[in-house]
Amino acid sequence: VLRETLQLLADTACKQPQRFLLLYTAAGEPDALAAPPWRLDGAIQFFTRANDFGFSKHPNETFRIWDRTQILSDVVRVIRTFRPQVLITRFSPEPGTTHGHHTASAQLALEAFQKAGDPSAFPEQLADGRLLPWSPTRVLWNSFPAAFRGGNRKAGDTAPATLQMDSGVYNPLLGESFGEIAA
């Protein structure tokens, strides 16, 4: 799924090669290290100082354990180092739609999106001149249609602007369909 998302966005949405940074938590997901994403898509995996402390129902609960400023600093550093054009969060930043860890990671991604280009945010990262402020162009939420049905939606809610891509199409550059790549 990670490779599918990256390649589709590069081919369909942007019409040129782009650098993407997917932000998600591996908390409670033991397979995250057993089958690293870069084996599928060539991505580099970064870790923050966030503790995996078990199940959390709300991001406020997560941030009582995680040092929000410290973790935000880590995410900003990754953005400034990697310099992606687009950030992709795996989960919604809205509380109640998923686990607290996941929601917290999406909230941190949105905050980092704003702060990474601001030289007054975490200036110690810029002090030696090796890192510079960097502003990705946009943030996308890698979701699925079921996320917009029932459950946590309120009357009158509308789905956010969406970019849909057919993952079953053949990619001539890769010589396979995206479904074949993901299989």
PLM feature spans:
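Active-site beta-strand->loop->alpha-helix modules in alpha/beta enzyme cores, enriched
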Residues: 1-123
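The feature marks non-catalytic terminal segments
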Residues: 115-183
